Amino acid sequence: MVSRSAFLLFCVLFLATEETLASLFSSRLIHRFSDEGRASIKTPSSSDSLPNKQSLEYYRLLAESDFRRQRMNLGAKVQSLVPSEGSKTISSGNDFGWLHYTWIDIGTPSVSFLVALDTGSNLLWIPCNCVQCAPLTSTYYSSLATKDLNEYNPSSSSTSKVFLCSHKLCDSASDCESPKEQCPYTVNYLSGNTSSSGLLVEDILHLTYNTNNRLMNGSSSVKARVVIGCGKKQSGDYLDGVAPDGLMGLGPAEISVPSFLSKAGLMRNSFSLCFDEEDSGRIYFGDMGPSIQQSTPFLQLDNNKYSGYIVGVEACCIGNSCLKQTSFTTFIDSGQSFTYLPEEIYRKVALEIDRHINATSKNFEGVSWEYCYESSAEPKVPAIKLKFSHNNTFVIHKPLFVFQQSQGLVQFCLPISPSGQEGIGSIGQNYMRGYRMVFDRENMKLGWSPSKCQEDKIEPPQASPGSTSSPNPLPTDEQQSRGGHAVSPAIAGKTPSKTPSSSSSYSFSSIMRLFNSLLLLHWLASLM
């Protein structure tokens, strides 16, 4: 009887641990030109400053943003894919230049920031103790919030800690005179003299558990310790409103937010993105994707390291016909509106699509796409299929972008352009719509499955094998509070005595489930 009870107790504790390590955190994505974005990040006086969706002006704006992003990519020193300033030709004032944003809360007491999201970079940085930052007042931006943006001050947060040069994640340690100094950071871009620089700190990122797309109440929220760039000085396009309230890098490096959440035992090392018809969507931290998803491995390009989310396409197919010599390497870039292919492959794909279109070719003023048309009805064209290893296929069912009708005629284009880089392309958001894109960093692979985004039921993943405890990603003996007193780093299930709001990997629902299970176990034991 005793051994049976012990076995039952072990099973209960094991299941509780599994639940703990299989959590999901969700946040709403806000597309800067979506209806939601117009309502939530615009002042009433600027309601007419952005064009209507599906108008030619709307797609000119997105294409111009992509062009500037591509221009910066060619000169990037650090990141593989970087932000663009966005177009200033339509907005009557300064405008956000990124594609997707989300609200995050940092510190104690918490302060809100509307950060840009980027799968092509790694660091989370926010304006902080500003020496040279973009303006943070709402009146400066034609498409910003009715409230001002915030500036972070580490000394005002009781949970902030200095991040030292001695830490292995301090890439600028060679610039430090002493390992006890605070670690500096600089992110440089050659094009436009764009950069962000300052000092690294550690503080709390506030998260909320997600269950089947329902955000749970505040009692189930957790606080995760992450490394943050205290961005004192910005330059170039960052001063023009590219990301005035900061940027969250979602890249594969250890210093990215997903890496810290995983190492803290709060989630599996993976996240997913989905986009709805309004171009907004959701990001799910900890999502490994459904069992039915297809996948392909990420590629290592630079010094056998994963410098971004890069995959290899074996062939491009139009319908059931695969084109010869169309293999290439491509970035998966959620921060880009449209898709770019290497010149020689772009030409083959475009000509094959053009062969299936029975419509009049048309040049639209201000539209850079080469293959545009006008017709009495939208033509039916075969799907574009990107073929990966193991016969996995990414299907683009609607390869054309249709504009608003004009005088009874339908205007449409093939929204693909040459990438300008030999053998390298970039898949943008326009061809991700309708899919749940899973960035599985644990197994270093990209997953995808059909999705209606807001209707998806995202189930918590199974815990990873062997993840019964979480390694602490932060220093154990050199971490310091703002006042200079040594403070132990937070670990799963344990918090320092002087920082009661430190992260815990146990959700409220997990604890209640464990409590109820123990009551059941006690009742079963009494019957034996």
Curated annotation (Swiss-Prot):
Residues 100-449 form the Peptidase A1 domain. Pfam families: TAXi_C (PF14541), TAXi_N (PF14543). InterPro entries: Aspartic_peptidase_A1, Aspartic_peptidase_AS, PEPTIDASE_A1, Peptidase_aspartic_dom_sf, TAXi_C, TAXi_N. Residues 494-503 have a biased composition (Low complexity). It is found in: Cell membrane. Residues 464-482 have a biased composition (Polar residues). It is a lipid-anchor; GPI-anchor. Its EC number is 3.4.23.-. GO terms for molecular function: aspartic-type endopeptidase activity. Keywords: Aspartyl protease, Cell membrane, Glycoprotein, GPI-anchor, Hydrolase, Lipoprotein, Membrane, Protease, Signal. A lipid is attached at residue 503 (GPI-anchor amidated serine). GO terms for cellular component: plasma membrane; side of membrane. Residues 1-22 form the signal peptide. Glycans are attached at residues 193, 217, 358, 391. The keyword Cell membrane applies. Residues 504-528 form a propeptide. The keyword Methyltransferase does not apply. Belongs to the peptidase A1 family. This is Aspartic proteinase-like protein 1.
